[in-house]
Amino acid sequence: MDILVIFHSNYSATFFRNTFKDHLLSFGRHADAEVYYFNTFIKESNYLKRQSFDLIIYHYSFMAQKWSCNGALLKHNWLKSIKGRRVAIAQDEYFNSNEVNEFLKYHDVKVLFSCCDRLQDIKLIYPKHLNNLEKVISVLPGYIETKNLKPLNRLKKHVNRKVDIFYRARNNSMVLGKLSLGKSRIAKEFLFLELPHLTLDISLDPDDTILGEQWFLSLENARVVLGVEGGASVFDPDGSLSSRVDEYMKNNPEASYSELNENVLKESEGSLDYKTISPRSFEAIMTNTCQVLHEGSYSSVLTPNKHYIQLNKDFSNIKNVLLLIENQEYCEKIATNAYRDIIGNNAHTYEKFVDIVISNGLKSRREFRHNNSRFWLKCQSKFHLYVFAQIIKIIRKYIY
């Protein structure tokens, strides 16, 4: 079986995030197939136009070109020349779905893997008359990469961890609605508290971003990590709402969310209930780090007060939560519950995800041919050389 994964990356810092790399490379690692990758950032391939595959997967990084709102996603018409059954993986589906649907229809994408888990949201974002989809399958935005797993007995005991509360996030644009504000609010609330007896490593500063292996080391050095559900509560199908928000904030830079909501978002707020468990939750579980999370459903993966300490969104139970955080034995018990239950059942691994994509993407599991042409050897060689060049470029930028 031959699979082509089409992605888009300029090898910025995002490329070095574990969540991105593990998702992208999961097909090459876990599919029982010959898997080839093509980065549309480089250039189009005349040779590739003449090839055929059993399955063509448009990765979410490719679909993310919708964020430019300049039709970038629609400028890859040449990809339609490649023969094969097409599927797509989508994320951040609350934004510019019109362009996505136009792409899906033109390229005759048959199956979409979506982070939506509510039928009414799927119908809103992907109305049938705008695409040729046969089905939409709900998946998570990230999974557990087993190659990154350490056995529980090899992870740091909580007594040896130097940081009590750890968190990294950014100030999300208010255009995503009230739901998305939780990421920054939870950080600000904890930073506002006077906790001299606890060691905090909490930041919303982009300069404090942690990538790669260092991210897992930071998690393993912390007893507790904060978190919220990912998603948005506002639907912006063509990007026009985002433009209105930008214009309003340009003229009113100190405006609060309440003011923005009253003047711009009011009719759109609550139009969508797009929320999902964050890949960060799985990373915390993998390092046996106790999570303090806002109340939520977390894609029905986690159980409150068994797999995480629940913090009310209005922070009304913050005093009790702080008492639990100070209880080192309790935090380690919660973390271990999550590790044994979530890691132990193997239901949320990238192996399972890849199987979901392939089994739902293909019409049948028949025997397939293999493509061993010299083109792919040449293509892979050029790909790795290009990645290496970009890494050197980034290193030089930070050193010099």
Where are these predicted regions, by residue range?
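Nucleotide-sugar donor-binding catalytic core of glycosyltransferases
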Residues: 1-51, 60-75, 88, 93-99, ...
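Acidic (Asp/Glu)-rich catalytic clusters
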Residues: 77-81
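C-terminal amphipathic helix plus adjacent low-complexity
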Residues: 153, 255, 317-400
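Hydrophobic, well-ordered secondary-structure elements that form the walls
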Residues: 284, 308, 338
